[in-house]
Amino acid sequence: MSFSDCVIKSEYRSLIDNVVQDFYLPILHEAVSYKRAVGFFSSSALAEISKGICDMASNGGKIQIVASPYLSEEDVKAIQEGYQNRETYIKKKVLKQIQDEDVSNDYYTLERLNLLTKLIEDGILDIKLAYTENNGGIGMYHEKMGLMEDSSGNIVAFSGSMNESATAMEVNYETIDVFCSW
């Protein structure tokens, strides 16, 4: 199956659609690449879309995130630990951990920092921080867009108000516009 076999709307609104269930999970299930640029990133987003990430990792997929440096202290530590330990862990360990069908979503929420660390350790996730040059010190990188690619080379691009956090995915009123390459 490829993206072209999925039902993809041209717009998702969080008060109408379940963006995680209706957009992220089906697309990540088919994806081999997920590139995201956001103003704010939180490991809570990984917990929300962990099933899709697991599917993508099983496809040999990779995630690349560019975000502003406004991260929680916990996420900074998890990211640092992930990069420090990247070479010492085997990819199958993280796949086994997040593939367990008997594990509840509460586990993912509780283990979000461990998930962030493991995805980085295993080379599945890379995070880069974007800084802006400004005169007053008040500007920040705040773009919000994403690209996902499947094994057939089909691309789904999206942009809108949504950051990469559980709050954006589950609580806020957010809109994304979606564009398909086919």
Q: What positions do the PLM features span?
A:
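PLD/PLD-like phosphodiesterase catalytic module centered on the HKD motif
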Residues: 1-182
